[in-house]
Amino acid sequence: MSGTLSIRNRQRAIPVDVRRLRRITLVLLRDLLAKETFELGICLVRQPEMTRLNETFLGHNGPTDVITFDYSDAGYEELGRADLRAGLDAPQRVPAGFMAGELARKEPRGLHGEIVICVQEAVSQARRFRTSWQRELARYVIHGLLHLEGYDDRRGADRRKMKREEGRLLRRLGRRCPIEPLARRVPSVGNSSIAHRGS
């Protein structure tokens, strides 16, 4: 079993325990989705950054909760560090540019992509749907993983199917791994980043 999971917290508005988020994501990948091979990046961003991504890549105004970039069938070439430093201004061959140098490969293997999440939107949506922002954040990770698995939410029937699967996985996750501790404060130095390589 091998996989690479990188998590970057580029926002400070909401304190997120990135170690717990890593654990939750690994439970989803390995135990609930039975993924043995994966290269996944999760990037937590603030609303202004998510708004720019949403407008640039989806053509929608304002922020959104989660955007998924699937690198599995694109065959991107390795990008240099200059592209990583460029952030949102990076060449569009790798859409978000957050972790492009780490994740882009000539020969994609297994589940391969990047999930960008706006934590402030999780807080806002949690209030609207009367749930915790931690559960909403876990739902966004699940949503992104399902997109990487091939689920589509553009049409009504497909959207309902995806929502059902999100709910099922969220319930199963809650039984296996506590979600609420995502709110716990953890010491951070500079840009919080946790990488995991399992084999």
Model feature map: region roles:
Residues 1-138, 146-199:
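An acidic/histidine-cluster motif and surrounding catalytic segment
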